[in-house]
Amino acid sequence: MNVFLSKSAEEKLLKLTEYLLEDWGSKAKKDFINKLTEKINQIALQPQSCPQSSAFKNLYKCVVTKQTTFYYRIVTNPKSIEI
């Protein structure tokens, strides 16, 4: 299934990766991007593999690291996943 980032998610991801690079170095940024990519691949193959949000119906919660979580929804037309 196709996975795409909302405009807000793109902006937040850019800020996060800049922070990681500036404060923690290129290895931390690379490690985070690898973990994020694994999670995106996971939900692309198995969209309902993460738990549904208890606060919002139709949202799923995906934990990337202890400090980082993203929420996504499954879009039916066209069939895709929005982060």
Regions found by a protein language model. Name each.
Residues 37, 48-83:
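Basic/aromatic recognition patch in beta-strand/loop cores that engages polyanionic ligands
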